[in-house]
Amino acid sequence: MKLSKAIDIFFKCAQVIDEEVCSLLSSYVATLRALYLLHQNHHWEAEDYQHHLLFQRLYESVQASADAAAERVVGLCGKLNDVDMYKLVESFEGDEFVESSLAAEEEFQKLAKTIYAKIKEKKCIDIGA
């Protein structure tokens, strides 16, 4: 993609990024951070080595995604809205580590789809769907 086209797309997107989208994007980052904490807690509390490694890989991959997403959201919105990620962690917690992590990941996917639909509705992006 030519630089001029990329700049045009950026400015088009910047014009449609409103408070609603910024709030959704802040929730996205908060949910990533909550997933990080959840997976890290499960990593520490895992009773067997396989689960210990699984949750370590999960929290390490989520950490990189959360950092990249937060930087982009701050670039678009100027700041992250306050979202209580600790309440999110509590809402994801369960007795079974694997099941609660899967449920949290499913909730994250739903949020990501909601954000994508909202941004697509504003005709800012389209990745062929």
Language-model regions, residue ranges each:
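Acidic/histidine-rich alpha-helical segments that form the ligand environment
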Residues: L25-Y28, M85-A129
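Phenylalanine-focused residue identity feature
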Residues: F10-F11, Y49, F55, F92, ...
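Generic structural signal for well-ordered, non-transmembrane alpha-helical segments
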Residues: S26-R33, L37, Q56, E60-D67, ...
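Charge-dense, intrinsically disordered terminal/linker segments
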Residues: M1-S23
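Short, N-terminal intrinsically disordered low-complexity segments that are rich in Pro/Gly
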Residues: D18-V21, L25-V29, D48, H52-F55
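Amphipathic, alpha-helical segments enriched in basic
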Residues: A14, D18, A30-L37, W44, ...
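Conserved alpha-helical segments that form or flank metal/cofactor-binding pockets of metalloenzymes
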Residues: Y49-V83
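Helix-loop segments that flank and shape redox-cofactor active sites
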Residues: A34-R57, T114-I127
